[in-house]
């Protein structure tokens, strides 16, 4: 996908005050990234940043041949990029204790959503970015229903509440 042409054709720079972000749905091989940040000071957002003369915004690219689980995964990769940039220490700890978008806390394999191995996780350590209980608790895929979409929802739901503004309001990232 030619991002410059897309931005020009839809006058996204001139109309920047009319939207918070842009979502594109397309088919396979349309060539867009899952997420890309555009603006004066964009960061890597699961794709190379694209510097343009406007406040930052994100273009999300979704494939209509894929499911809601994959759309949530694309969004979760955006979350990973933004949090790794803004809160690197906290986010590394979160990933070690809760898991990454691809790898739940109770496995070492990508996409192993139905793993019933019990393991310790500490999701509730991060409501204010400070550990309060180093023990955590034992759990497995039953936490998210042992499905991909369940894991994406669970992973996003366990993020600290005070990071959502950073994730969604990227104009000043």
Where are these regions (language model features)?
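Short catalytic/ligand-binding loop motif for oxyanion handling, primarily in non-cytosolic enzymes
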Residues: 31-34, 80, 87-88
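Active-site-proximal segments of metallohydrolase catalytic domains
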Residues: 1-45
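Hydrophobic beta-strand segments of well-ordered beta-sheets in folded domains
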Residues: 20-24, 56-58, 99
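Active-site recognition of the HExxH zinc-binding catalytic motif
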Residues: 65-86
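Active-site-proximal beta-strand/loop segments in catalytic clefts of secreted hydrolases
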Residues: 25-29, 62-63, 81
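Active-site scaffold of zinc-dependent metalloenzymes
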Residues: 32-33, 37-64
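Arginine residue identity/basic-tract feature
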Residues: 15-16, 36, 40, 52, ...
């Amino acid at each position: 996908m030619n991002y410059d042409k897309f931005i020009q054709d839809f006058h996204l720079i001139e109309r920047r005050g009319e939207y918070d972000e842009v979502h594109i749905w397309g088919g396979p091989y349309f060539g867009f990234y899952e997420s890309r940040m555009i603006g004066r000071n964009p960061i890597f957002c699961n794709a190379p940043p694209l510097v343009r003369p406007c406040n930052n915004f994100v273009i999300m690219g979704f494939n209509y041949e894929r499911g809601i689980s994959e759309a949530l995964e694309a969004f979760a990769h955006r979350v990973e990029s933004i949090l790794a940039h803004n809160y690197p220490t906290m986010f590394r700890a979160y990933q070690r204790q809760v898991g990454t978008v691809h790898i739940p806390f109770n496995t070492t394999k990508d996409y192993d959503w139905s793993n019933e191995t019990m393991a310790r996780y500490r999701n509730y350590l991060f409501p204010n970015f400070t550990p309060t209980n180093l023990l955590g608790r034992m759990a497995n895929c039953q936490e998210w229903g042992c499905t991909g979409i369940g894991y994406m929802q669970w992973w996003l739901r366990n993020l600290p509440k005070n990071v959502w503004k950073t994730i969604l309001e990227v104009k000043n990232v």
